Regions:
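Short conserved segments within the C-terminal catalytic ATPase subdomain
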Residues: 56-65
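Helix-loop junction within the histidine kinase core
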Residues: 26-37
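Short alpha-helical Gxxx[C/S/T] motif in the catalytic ATP-binding
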Residues: 151, 155
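Short conserved segment of the HATPase_c
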Residues: 126-138
């Protein structure tokens, strides 16, 4: 009986996630998704995301923030940034076997005036012919892995709405590396 209850619970959670994902895409496309920008300290914010992901993992995978990092204030929507990064971390977790690692990193690209975030794993990787498909709705690389196939589409739309872009690092061959850009703004420029 417990086994059936667990199956019902799992399927209920998947259905709720699917509904939530479809609503997010609908809000993004109609311009009705709310963005609340504020100054956010990245080291603590990223470390909190790592802690959250570590708490929910079911496989022994090392998830870490690339260190050392200097404190950095980014003008962003902290909730949307968290949604993007946790989605990327959770995807990496799905495809990284026990004993593997996942690294969250970020660096300023002064020339392009953006922050570059990356999530790198030592998982199964993504075949080259599938790399552009992963950002399409309902696209799943593996039908046996849980998920709606909407997470990366939501990430891409959200990142584009915030003025950035997302892509797969084709040069990385030891798993998968997703990189996304986020515009930066100087703190002084917003003070009056």
């Amino acid at each position: 009986l417990k086994e059936y209850a667990d199956i019902v619970q799992t399927n209920s959670n998947l259905l709720l996630q699917l509904i939530s994902d479809v609503l997010d895409i609908s809000r993004l496309e109609s311009g009705k998704l709310q963005f609340n920008y504020e100054w956010c300290e990245l080291v603590n914010h990223c470390q909190n995301m790592i802690t959250l992901t570590n708490r929910n993992k079911t496989v022994d995978v090392d998830i870490k923030l690339q260190m050392p990092k200097e404190p950095y204030m980014l003008y962003t929507d902290p909730l949307r940034l968290q949604q993007i990064i946790i989605n990327l971390l959770n995807n990496a977790l799905k495809f990284t076997p026990a004993g593997g690692s996942i690294t969250l990193d970020y660096e300023v690209d002064e020339e392009k005036q953006c922050m570059l975030f990356s999530v790198t794993d030592t998982g199964t990787g993504i075949p080259e012919d599938k790399q552009e498909l992963v950002f399409q709705r309902f696209e799943k690389l593996n039908e046996f892995v849980q998920g709606t196939g909407l997470g990366l589409a939501i990430c891409k739309l959200t990142i584009q709405y915030m003025g950035g872009d997302i892509w797969i690092d084709k040069s990385y061959k030891n798993g998968a590396r997703f990189i996304f850009s986020h515009p930066i703004k100087k703190q002084e420029s917003t003070e009056k």
